[in-house]
């Protein structure tokens, strides 16, 4: 059995390019100070020899691991069942891959998970962190801050210290909710119910606020809390029908809850949209197109949200730049617009 060819070394690349080992190291590790003709010779030698830098050695030089932690504050059963997370992770993955960075997925459900994640982050395994689906009063932001890692959050900050130099990407949740309710009013509906998401998350709070902006005098009996799952939407719809059987419209805080609400309405013999008009939030395809009837909903670009989170973090990781961590600097956020997509449910 023949032995495999030895792995090309930095010295072999230097000999092929006719330059010093230090010059090869600077080019391979992305440092400035090498004239372009020399840099091109090094790159050509790297290609010809099939040289692959040793990541451990490279990390010692650059102090970079080319790896980013993506922390989702949800149990794995939720993350792998809800297509929202797949969309956001796809956007993050595309951006990181385009810049030769690896994604390290960390899920946290309880305090034991928080401690495990905090130890991992403090261990110097990754260059930064992307965090989403945080819950109000979650200890994660403080743990991440103590690890000293550049971080970008998905969603508006809403925790102690959350106004100091926080980087985040969010959707115009409040404006989207207003658009949804105004659309229902334009259809002549007046007894409009709202199924909220989990109210320990800012997206649900903002959508409830948007609902109240338009329906300031609404009956509290027309609001029921869900948790962004289809089962909670179905349960909430039954509760609402029990309290207010005269309701003529529902704005659900996401498409999964809207799909659950549609099931409950069918069970109770309510026609959609004739008896009750229904609007969701997300435009989660193919769900929104496959409900019966197809769902009118507020579209947010979930994948773009993930891409922008990764892009902001990678920008902070570039040499010579750093996130603004000055106390009192205020959050530095990007808020993405939303659009109402009209289908048959309203």
Predicted features, each with a name:
Residues 74-87, 105-113, 169-179, 195-238, ...:
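Hinge/beta->alpha junction and helix N-cap segments in small-molecule ligand-binding domains
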Residues 1-5, 67-71, 75-182, 242:
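Alpha-helical recognition/docking segments in bacterial nutrient-uptake
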Residues 1-66:
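N-terminal helix-turn-helix DNA-binding module of bacterial transcription factors
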Residues 23, 63-77, 183, 191-197:
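Short beta-strand segments enriched in small/hydrophobic residues
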Residues 243-346:
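Flexible loop/turn connectors
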Residues 20, 66, 127, 190-191, ...:
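Short acidic/polar active-site loop segments enriched in Thr and Asp
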Residues 190-192, 218-221, 272-278:
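Short acidic capping loops at alpha-helix termini that bridge into adjacent secondary structure
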């Amino acid at each position: 059995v023949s032995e495999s060819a030895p792995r090309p070394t930095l010295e072999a690349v230097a000999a092929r390019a006719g330059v010093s080992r230090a010059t090869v190291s600077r080019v391979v590790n992305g440092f400035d100070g090498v004239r372009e003709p020399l840099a091109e010779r090094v790159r050509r030698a790297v290609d010809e020899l099939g040289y692959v830098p040793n990541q451990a050695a490279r990390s010692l030089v650059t102090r970079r691991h080319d790896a980013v932690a993506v922390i989702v504050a949800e149990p794995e059963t939720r993350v792998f069942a809800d297509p929202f997370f797949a969309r956001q992770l796809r956007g993050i993955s595309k951006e990181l891959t385009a810049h030769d960075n690896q994604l390290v997925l960390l899920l946290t459900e309880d305090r034991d998970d928080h401690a495990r994640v905090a130890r991992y982050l403090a261990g110097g395994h990754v260059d930064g962190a992307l965090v989403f689906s945080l819950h109000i009063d979650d200890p994660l932001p403080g743990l991440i801050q103590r690890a000293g890692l550049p971080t970008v959050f998905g969603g508006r900050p809403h925790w102690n210290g959350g106004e100091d130099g926080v980087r985040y990407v969010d959707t115009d949740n409040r404006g989207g909710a207003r658009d949804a309710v105004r659309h229902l009013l334009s259809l002549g509906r007046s007894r409009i119910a709202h199924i909220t998401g989990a109210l320990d998350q800012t997206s649900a709070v903002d959508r409830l606020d948007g609902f109240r902006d338009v329906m300031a005098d609404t009956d509290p009996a027309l609001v029921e809390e869900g948790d962004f799952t289809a089962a909670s939407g179905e349960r909430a719809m039954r509760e609402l029908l029990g309290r207010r059987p005269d309701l003529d419209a529902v704005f659900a805080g996401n498409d999964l809850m809207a799909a659950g609400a549609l099931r409950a309405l069918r069970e109770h013999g309510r026609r959609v949209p004739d008896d009750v008009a229904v609007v969701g939030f997300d435009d989660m395809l193919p769900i929104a197109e496959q409900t019966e009837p197809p769902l009118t909903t507020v579209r947010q670009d979930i994948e773009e949200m993930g891409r922008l989170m990764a892009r902001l973090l990678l920008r902070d990781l570039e040499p010579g730049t750093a996130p603004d961590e000055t106390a009192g600097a205020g959050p530095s956020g990007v808020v993405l617009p939303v659009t109402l997509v009209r289908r048959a449910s309203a």
